[in-house]
Amino acid sequence: LNHKLKRILAILMIVPVLMMTIFAAPGAVSAEEDLGLRVDAAILIDADTGQILYGKNEDATLGIASMSKMMTEYLLFEAIEEGRITWEQEYTVSDYAYAVSQDRRLSNVPLRNGEKYTIRELYEALAIYSANAATIGIAETLAGSETKFIKLMDEKAQELGLKDYKFVNSTGLNNSYLQGMHPQGTGENDENVMPAKSVALLAYHLLKDYPEVLEATSVPKKVFREGTSDAIQMDNWNFMLPGLVYEYEGVDGLKTGTTDLAGHSFTGTAKRDDTRLIAVVLKAVDEKGNGSYKARFDAARSLFDYGFNQFVKAEILPADHAFKGNEALPVNKGEEKEVKIGLTEPVTMLVKSSDQDKYTAEFIADESKMKDGELEAPVKEGTSVGKANIVHADGQPVYGNVDGTPASIDVVTKEAVEKAGWFSLTLQAIGDFFAGIWDKSTGWVKGLF
């Protein structure tokens, strides 16, 4: 009884540890990596691969304010690319957009009711000055109404793999600022929300698919409709741009956001040499607990410093890396009984400077490509047969990617194996038959002794 009780107690102690290991968030950071950020949530990723470098409360659903406009930008660039609209296409200002544009509490370029503006003018006002009425104008152009545009936002969010999002308008404003004309089906005090991880994933796709967005987001200031009576100075709210008060080397985007719900938030991107990072901070505050422009940019600076100073881009596995115990896979009915497997390319990723030589890979076979543990001949060279998950030699967690996938690379066959002819198959069958008899015989003889 005493022995059984000890076993039960041991199991009860082990289970919580296992549960914590199994369900630990891939972006979670250890205590020694605590950056002391005063934010509700934050995340730092490699803009090229989506690899998570740091995370704090990144899965919590929070207000995102004008960072919502990154989705509007994505849908605009997609429409331009597909030829559905053009940069020089004109938009006629609606009563709704006009009313919002006249609200001096908001970031806006004042629009004249019934006046025509090009899509390029509206986009630059959005990207540089976070102009809300201009954003509504783009939404109405793309979908006919902001109500219909929200459906486009939802569909694209699902397609891009965003999680736990809710869009109620195109701008990120609280609906109470929309002059009673907020989109149908949304509440008068509703606001867009999303986890920091989804914000980072949206920024990742925006930069991957439409890097030209940086041409506008990197502009510190510009005059809207220069040379006309409607001219107005547009100062970029991203004060980390070169020449601005909180400038940071390499910053060229991306989007700020400020509401009571979202606080002072920011999605920034910076590039140094061949490394580009994306940082997201939600509801940043100072040491007194007050939100401010400085607080959000200080938090972003800490993230960028951590990424650029602590990580290096290194080749951690060569293209000819051999999987110990899995150098080849068996092939059924082939001219050869097995086929060599390997990586498609060297594995290069951002790693801690001190950890460059501490990584290896675990081969995970794609069972859908196999039958009873074997590949079926013929097998083409370059056939995908599974994934190689990157693992740390010391057992430390390897951050996954912002889209939820593990750090991995494709594993393929390194040669072709043709299907054996009937004569070869017959010889193989005979050989297997006698090999089986030999194994049984030797086993019987060993049993005698």
Give residue spans per PLM region:
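Sec-dependent N-terminal signal peptides of Gram-positive bacterial secreted proteins and lipoproteins
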Residues: 2-30
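Short alpha-helical segments used as structural interaction elements across diverse proteins
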Residues: 3-4, 66, 296
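N-terminal pre-first-transmembrane soluble regions of secretory-pathway and organelle membrane proteins
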Residues: 7, 21, 25, 39-40, ...
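Hydrophobic alpha-helical membrane context
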Residues: 18-19, 81, 303
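Generic detector of short alpha-helix boundary/capping microenvironments
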Residues: 19, 37-38, 60-61, 102, ...
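Domain-terminus/edge residues, biased toward the C-terminal soluble/receptor-binding domains
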Residues: 179-180, 187-193, 197-449
